[in-house]
Design a protein with these regions (language model features):
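Short, electropositive alpha-helical surface patch
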Residues: 156-167, 262, 274-275, 282, ...
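Di-metal (Zn2+ and/or Mg2+/Mn2+) metal-binding site signature of metallo-dependent hydrolases
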Residues: 8-9
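Aromatic-lined glycan-binding groove of carbohydrate-active enzymes
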Residues: 204, 208-212, 247-297
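Hydrophobic faces of well-ordered beta-strands that scaffold small-molecule active sites
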Residues: 3-5, 101-103, 143-146, 171-173, ...
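Aromatic-anchored helix/helix-loop segment that forms the rim or "lid"
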Residues: 233-242, 247, 284-315
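Active-site gating/metal-coordination segments in enzymes
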Residues: 65-242, 246-249
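Mid-to-C-terminal alpha-helical segments outside catalytic/metal-binding sites
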Residues: 1-3, 12-100, 129-137, 158-162, ...
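Glycine-enriched alpha-helix->loop->beta-strand junction motifs that scaffold or abut catalytic
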Residues: 165-170, 198-203, 223-225, 255-258, ...
Length: 386
């Protein structure tokens, strides 16, 4: 059995144009087709171009094939429809041996980088309402993660509570805060959110490309070799830095039942991060005030859950990190997805690195089921909506 801890919906092109109040229509995020390559891109008036929505649904299809098919027919639909159609998704997942998946946004990631608090909150409510309807098709197998507005922390807490009532299973907040607005993770700004998430038993997440440090990364991607390579490092470094900040700030010391998922940043950094934060703690932090009563790696292993897609370096280092807080994901329907050969991909990696059956089960379904309280007796069988 496989359960993906990080997959994606691909929002309808006109979701926000149709659902936001008429007074916000001109500002509404939308999909726009580029006449030069016929790809659809997520755009917001007055902002840099966002994610390539065409390539966000092309699991199992090469970029070259996408280009050739669009050149022949610019209006062609290419790729999976499960990003916006829950019934198609359930069929695609079952065919791939995936019994359930945790759903993150595609276009919606960049909404967490908006500076206009009221406009952002309106956009996030639209997304969360749509996602809740999507997941209602099969709530045991489609586990939606809500987007949370954090400029006003009370608004963020209310939205997390609303998400819980809607049947969503967690909340996603900005991966890194704006550097110049007094919202560092070391401040008390977030305390109500940490407490609410722990009390509600709602895991929180940070995801690559959803923070203020990487605000323009997507727009720059592909423009130059420098920006393209930097994109690959910057998006994951942002997640790692925020993990360290949350640990050092004593967030998990104060809220031991809080769970935070580091999504799509991989696990190749995990052993190095553990060693470095413990070394720093042992050598330097004893010379100053610290809220921590345990080694930093204790909080990393007990409160931070890391997802990976295909990560040979990270899997080779499981002997250092353990496997109890690491979760496999297939990234469907994005171009980097293991779909439609997820079982083959997992089996190859496990064989190559000598991963035993119990560890494989932890990585591919036990850990995620434990974190999100997935009913395994239900999801073992095919969805009634197939």
């Amino acid at each position: 059995m496989l359960i993906s801890a990080d997959s994606h919906v691909v929002e309808p092109h006109d979701l926000w144009v149709e659902a936001l109040p008429a007074s916000l229509t001109d500002q509404a995020p939308r999909a726009v087709q580029d006449p030069s390559n016929h790809h659809w891109y997520f755009e917001m008036p007055g902002h840099a171009r966002g994610v390539d929505l065409t390539l966000s649904r092309t699991a199992g299809i090469s970029n070259a094939d996408v280009g050739a098919r669009l050149a022949a027919d610019p209006s062609a639909w290419i790729g999976a429809r499960g990003g916006h159609d829950p019934h198609e998704r359930l069929r695609d997942l079952w065919a791939d041996g995936v019994h359930a998946d945790v759903l993150y946004p595609t276009a919606g990631l960049s909404l967490l980088q908006l500076d206009d608090a009221s406009f952002q909150a309106a956009c996030l409510r639209v997304y969360n309402d749509w996602l809740a309807e999507f997941c209602k098709t099969d709530p045991d197998r489609l586990l939606g993660i809500a987007l949370l507005p954090l400029w006003d922390i009370d608004e963020g807490v209310r939205e997390l509570e609303r998400a819980k009532a809607l049947g969503l299973r967690g909340g996603l907040f900005w991966t890194s805060p704006p550097a110049d607005r007094g919202h560092s993770f070391f401040t008390a700004h977030y305390e109500k959110l940490w407490a609410a998430a722990a009390a509600l038993e709602m895991p929180l997440s940070i995801h690559i490309l959803a923070g203020h440090r990487t605000k323009n990364s997507v727009a720059k991607f592909g423009k130059s070799i420098e920006d393209t390579f930097y994109f690959g490092f910057e998006s994951r470094d942002e997640v790692q830095r925020s993990i360290v900040e949350l640990i050092a700030a004593g967030v998990f010391q104060r809220h031991p039942k809080l769970n935070i998922v580091a999504a799509e940043a991989g696990i190749d950094y995990a052993a190095r991060l553990e060693r470095r934060i413990d070394s720093t703690f042992g050598r330097f932090l004893s010379l100053m005030e610290t809220p921590l009563t345990e080694k930093p790696s204790h909080y990393f292993r007990n409160n931070v859950w890391c997802t990976y897609i295909a990560d040979p370096v990270g899997l080779n280092n499981l002997r250092f990190t353990g496997a109890d807080h690491i979760m496999w994901s297939n990234d469907y329907p994005h171009g980097s997805a293991t779909w439609p050969r997820s079982n083959e991909s997992v089996s190859q990696e496990c064989e190559e690195f000598g991963i035993d059956a119990d560890t494989r089960d932890k990585l591919t379904w036990k850990n995620v089921a434990r974190l999100y309280d997935i009913d395994l007796d239900v999801v073992r069988d095919p969805s009634p909506h197939l």
